[in-house]
Amino acid sequence: MFFIINDLKECISALKLKFDDQKELVKLVKNNSFNGFSSTIIFQLKSENHKKIADSIVEWFLKNKKDNYQNVFIANNNFINFQISYQKYLEYLIKTPCFTKKNIKILIESVSANPTGRIHLGHVRIAFFGDVLNNLAKLLGYTTVCEYWVNDYGQQARVFSFSVYQSLQLKKNIAIQQHPDGYSGIVIDKIASEIENFPVDNLNFEEFCKTSFLDHFLVNCTQKVLSLIKSDLNKIHVFIDSWKFESEIVKKTNFNDLLEQLKPNSYFYQDNALWLKTTLYGDDKDRVLIRSDKRASYFGTDVAYHLEKLQRGFDILFNVWGTDHEGHIKRMYCAFDALKNTTKTSLKIFALQLVTLYKNKELVRLSKRAGNVITIETMLSMISEDAARWFMLSQNNGTIIKIDLDIANLQNSANPVYYVQYAFARMNSILRIANSDQLKEITDCSLLINEKEISLLNQLVYYPFMLQKAMETGELHLLTNFLYETASLFHSWYKVCKINDDKNSLLSAQRLALLRSLQFIVKQILDVLKISTPQQM
């Protein structure tokens, strides 16, 4: 599809037309009246004579790009429709998609769950999203780093450590005064049992925070939780390249340098504490960077972290957050614009909604603070990783995921994961029994005239564009949508056409070439999603 966009831009330049290049120029269309690619470019042009302009665009295409198109015409709705030539389709059948290496570095901040417990169901969607975004960017030729931001500096980390300390106090029969936001449960008790020889006194939270051993104790607790978190992520095949600690950023950040970075834009002001003018970006109030006691706020350390990201020379920053951080997004964009000054680094924040599980139409409940969570082990006992990845990535980021476990565990076409995997296995089966002569490289594909075949050829043309769009926008559900649609088209094609026909070797060779290309891209997306690709089912 990129070649259609490029041809259209060349045409617009040749005809000296002006248009809004922020809008999508071309879309894949499948309906009863047309099966191909369509453009609304006419409505984006700064001209009142749409009909005349449309005629000139069609005339230019038919004169200058006839090798690429079987037909270019104006539809009743004034859209310009493109039917691809078989000569162009052939390119997609004899060459597998190849993505050139790009000199662009991407940092993906993902998971970043507070080190106050194990990974739970809500984190899994974020973990899968960051993992797949990382895989996709690598496939497209980008250099990537997937990073976990460890919040080990603030109040929450102290409360968690104190909860471990109180578990030790209880073991030694010391009366405790429970912190109102304290943690309890298996993780707290497990960490306490691993450091049970640590000496404890009758300390309340304020006294605990003033002890000389606080930093050492906090680091110890954090490392033990991170060990559990890494183990959890390994179980779902999510691997982090880099771990950045909030405490380390605070230690090495010269906040005077940070202020110098913000000064040129006059984004901050002093009023007892140091404030950033986040209201400029629609925030309901300005936010504190440095408190009156000179300690950095949670937001302040996050700003320092993003300055450090910029200093490492990344071109694109992707932050994968949960919607519990939604209020943080506007202020982060404000801070980033103030920080980056003349650099061209871009920041994109993806906020992912919650995940819920349903069994027998009833909600499976969870509660992290009470220690009663749906852990990785529990999740994997209820649903396969393949199904979990599919269902958590198959909807818009802002949609609450509601996984019906009864459907997710079905071994039939009602389960979309099974449906796609079965299509892949069936493709393999057909290719496996084809003889070598039938699988030779073809020089023509004009016998592929069935409507399903045209739709599948268009899928091949659309594929590279879809991948790039999914990566840039974070709309990873485009991947699962594409897979399901391709599988559906394939199953329909399989029913109406004999793909491997001994009585028509020429047609069979062309159909098998199409099948081989489809099998390649289906496997490529499943690999990006880290969903298994069974050879037979």
Curated annotation (Swiss-Prot):
Q: Does the keyword Aminoacyl-tRNA synthetase apply?
A: yes
What SMART domains does this protein map onto? DALR_1 (SM00836)
One GO MF annotation is: ATP binding
Going by the record, the broad EC class of this enzyme is ligase
Q: What is its EC number?
A: 6.1.1.19
Q: Which reaction does it catalyse?
A: tRNA(Arg) + L-arginine + ATP = L-arginyl-tRNA(Arg) + AMP + diphosphate
Q: Which UniProt keywords apply?
A: Aminoacyl-tRNA synthetase, ATP-binding, Cytoplasm, Ligase, Nucleotide-binding, Protein biosynthesis
Motif 'HIGH' region located where? 113-123
Q: Which HAMAP family match?
A: Arg_tRNA_synth
Q: What is this protein called?
A: Arginine--tRNA ligase
| Species for this entry | Mycoplasma genitalium (strain ATCC 33530 / DSM 19775 / NCTC 10195 / G37) (Mycoplasmoides genitalium)
